[in-house]
A protein has these predicted regions:
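C-terminal, surface-exposed recognition/capping segments
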Residues: 3-52, 57-74, 78-192
């Protein structure tokens, strides 16, 4: 007998059988952005910079002096359970999608770029366009991926481009990621 599908997940009919969450972490609404997590951290915070990043050791000016994990020290390239925000916040069985998971989604689903215009809450005479992706699986079921943009100084154009994290460390052809690289995300350009 097949296991029941958790209420907050959806089976898109992917070849791997992987279930996807119906919403981003930090919200139960599929159209909301949810919370922002630094890669390898399991809680949100008010200040996202080198000196507050748990995987960096910095000097007093915030200059990175050492990468504490996922570096040439340990050669780990995929988030471990204790560093996975989905596992820490949603429980056993949940995890941040890998590059392979995202590729399966890109290869096997129909992607539709949709823009919805909504009134601004404080001034209903003004409107804001909100972009999102409707991702329909082989079985006809779908998930919604809001256009998230990036975070602060890295990239922040949530009206168009979308960046979702992967559990994989970005690898350069000659080794592990550069300590200044923020390429741990799937970039979805508007429209695909």
């Amino acid at each position: 007998e097949p296991m029941p599908i958790p209420k907050n997940c959806i089976d898109l009919g992917l070849p791997s059988g992987l279930l996807w969450a119906k919403s981003n972490m930090g919200t139960t609404e599929p159209t909301e952005l949810g919370d922002y997590y630094a890669w390898g951290e399991t809680s949100t915070k008010n200040d996202y910079k080198n000196s507050t990043y748990k995987l960096y050791k910095t000097d007093k000016d915030g200059i990175i002096k050492e990468i504490l994990k996922y570096s040439e020290k340990d050669w780990k390239t995929v988030l471990e359970r204790e560093d996975d925000a989905a596992n820490a916040n949603l429980g056993v069985g949940y995890r941040i999608p890998t590059q392979e998971d995202w590729q399966e989604l890109l290869d096997n689903c129909k992607w539709e770029a949709v823009t919805v215009t909504l009134p601004i809450e404080l001034d209903p005479s003004q409107t804001k366009s909100i972009a999102r992706w409707i991702v329909t699986g082989p079985n006809g079921k779908y998930i919604i991926l809001p256009a998230t943009g990036g975070f602060k100084t890295w990239y922040n154009d949530s009206d168009k481009d979308t960046y979702y994290t992967t559990a994989n460390l970005y690898l350069y052809p000659d080794g592990l990621a550069d300590k200044y690289s923020y390429k741990r995300a799937v970039a979805l350009k508007w429209p695909i």
